[in-house]
Amino acid sequence: MSTEILGDTIDIHGGGADLEFPHHTNEIAQSEAKTGKTFANYWTHNGFVNIDNVKVSKSLGNFITVHDALETIDGQVLRFFFATQHYRKPINFTEKAVRDAETNLKYLKNTYEQPFTGTVDAQELQAFKDKFVAAMDEDFNTANGITVVFEMAKWINSGNYDVAVKEALAAMLEVFGIVFVEEVLDEEIEALIQKRQEARANRDFATADQIRDQLAAQGIKLLDTKDGVRWTRDWCQSH
């Protein structure tokens, strides 16, 4: 099936650490005996997820789905939490670990929202960029990549405010799917909500949906209730 869809050689082949032997060993033997070509260029075997230091197991019923986790955890916080761990190592999912991830992400957002109006040493900035790339080139070492991000954030907060630095910070975080959005004034939000309500009253649902999407892109969640529209502001936006 894989060779039919992806060709004789797959670029990246993933799977759980428990599949490395004998499952993937057999895949290699069978495929390369048939094609005479390398079956996969890179293998990414992920570690297991533990919850409160207990291995996740269907028989124990101690698992949680991503869908359920997102009911109480911001998507970017969850993504950031996983990025702080190397994918090959076991991950211990705990309430404290998630809270720590949220606190650390807020620190990075506060750093990002500083007024970047100064100048910096271009060579110092390039050194951070090179260090980040080197970390990610080391077997997708997101944990080390995040460490570099925090090192640069500390450097920024010591007075190195420049637009180029802000762009570099944003580019690094975007590698992990983390995108911060600019704040929207409450008056602007209320005005757009009123415009959406008028569009709905006129059965102009296309405009109403467009406004909802516009607000969502700015980190504003709308909730239609029998008492009217309620809205909440996400401190970071999930992409």
Regions found by a protein language model. Name each.
Residues 1-72, 78:
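Catalytic cores of enzymes that engage adenine nucleotides and/or redox cofactors via long glycine-rich
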